[in-house]
């Protein structure tokens, strides 16, 4: 039976929900005369639904009929799910109609491998040409590059889309070979390198010719699945740092694995997604991008998993407590960034303001410094530091100020650095949820205090 456009949209939008590499673009070019849509930053407001989908972009697959059989993917060819495929004209018209009704401000376009990577990419290119050339759509377009696509097609796509992305999916070649035998390291990193080189060449051309065509002006991103394979947090973070440095990625996205198939190579269907681990990876990724940390400083060979109770920055500060306190009126900018409670914006404010006069606690508070945490790591005018004192009482006081309160609503059973009774396990034994959270929190405080 022939599917209606709404049936296709329902199937293909649902099939795209597991791809998280979709956020605010960072692109900023205003609308041009005779076009519709704008990539101007204030107009790109991205809202997210409860399951993480971005609702201001039309986030959809062109097809979920896949020739690949990646075991972690809901759209793999061996899975019995409803299938659908848009024609290029259908998808282009749907995007324009949604835009005209103010439902969306752009398009996130991906696809399962319909036949071959090149055939799939050619169909995606047809959609982009219709939007850009026939409908004169000037809004934001993020296009997913299919591993194995020929360089010529990737080059064409880069001049039509604002951002490209090639998903790494799994953090090691061994896991790719085991869980996604149709993909390989070369088919992923070759297009990633091509996009990086073409983007740099485009930027150089623009310095010489202001009307030179732009290649993926919003850069490229990628996504890794966390928890489907045995790689450690340390391994994942090392890979992310390498991709940032080698390919100039704008963003690495991390997706906690949601079991979608009963496969002995994957976690069981009743396994909970490692959301806390995903959260810690995003926090560590932020340190790499904005706080001048190196991956080896956050995790190392001896500690390859994140602390479940402290965010990565606080954990580093606790492990290097001998470097503190620092005088905010004299400390280098790089050291200010490492103080818990001081972010890049407040660090810049401190650096600029201290040139005029010495700063005290009142000035720091107005600059956005979170003194609840920072007070144990700084000195300033009129303040010699909130020394926790010697003994267990002092260590507990600083621990309570630094500990992440959000972890206790989910439990920390996914990480084995400490071994407190997990919240969920206590609740299953009949302990009230709030009481279970308090018990786990107190145990965590004791563990961290001993570590200090």
Spans of model-derived segments:
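Flexible, acidic/Gly-rich N-terminal and inter-domain linker regions that tether
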Residues: 1-65, 370, 378, 386-452
């Amino acid at each position: 039976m022939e599917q209606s456009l709404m049936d296709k949209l329902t199937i293909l939008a649902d099939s795209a929900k597991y791809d998280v590499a979709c956020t605010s673009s960072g692109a900023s070019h205003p609308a041009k005369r005779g076009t519709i849509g704008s990539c101007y930053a204030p107009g790109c407001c991205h809202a997210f639904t409860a399951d993480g989908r971005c609702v201001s972009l039309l986030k959809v697959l062109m097809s979920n009929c896949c020739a690949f059989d990646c075991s972690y993917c809901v759209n793999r060819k061996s899975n019995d799910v409803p299938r659908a495929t848009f024609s290029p004209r259908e998808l282009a018209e749907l995007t324009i109609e949604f835009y005209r009704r103010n439902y969306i401000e752009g398009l996130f376009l991906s696809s399962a491998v319909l036949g071959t990577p090149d055939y799939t990419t050619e169909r995606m290119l047809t959609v982009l040409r219709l939007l850009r050339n026939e409908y004169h759509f000037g809004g934001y377009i993020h296009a997913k590059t299919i591993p194995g696509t020929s360089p010529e097609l990737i080059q064409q796509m880069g001049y039509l889309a604002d951002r490209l992305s090639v998903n790494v999916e799994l953090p090691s070649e061994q896991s790719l070979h085991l869980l996604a035998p149709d993909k390989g390291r070369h088919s992923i990193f070759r297009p990633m390198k091509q996009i990086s080189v073409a983007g740099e060449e485009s930027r150089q051309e623009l310095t010489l010719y202001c009307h030179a065509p732009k290649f993926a002006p919003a850069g490229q991103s990628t996504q890794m699945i966390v928890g489907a394979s045995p790689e450690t947090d340390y391994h994942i973070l090392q890979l992310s740092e390498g991709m940032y440095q080698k390919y100039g990625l704008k963003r690495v996205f991390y997706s906690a694995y949601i079991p979608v198939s009963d496969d002995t190579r994957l976690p069981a269907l009743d396994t909970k997604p490692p959301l806390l681990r995903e959260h810690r990876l995003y926090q560590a990724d932020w340190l790499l991008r904005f706080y001048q940390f190196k991956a080896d400083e956050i995790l190392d060979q001896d500690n390859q998993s994140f602390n479940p109770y402290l965010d990565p920055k606080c954990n580093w500060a606790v492990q290097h407590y001998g470097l503190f306190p620092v005088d905010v009126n004299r400390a280098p900018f790089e050291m200010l960034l490492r103080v818990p409670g001081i972010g890049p914006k407040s660090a810049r404010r401190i650096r600029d303001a201290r040139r005029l006069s010495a700063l005290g606690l009142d000035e720091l508070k107005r600059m956005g410094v979170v003194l609840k945490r920072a007070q144990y790591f700084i000195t300033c005018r009129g303040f010699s530091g909130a020394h926790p004192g010697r003994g267990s009482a002092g260590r507990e006081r600083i621990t309570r100020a630094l500990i992440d309160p959000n972890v206790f609503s989910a439990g920390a059973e996914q990480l084995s650095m400490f071994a407190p009774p997990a919240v969920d396990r206590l609740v299953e034994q009949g302990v009230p949820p709030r009481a279970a959270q308090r018990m786990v929190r107190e145990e965590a405080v004791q563990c961290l205090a001993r570590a200090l």
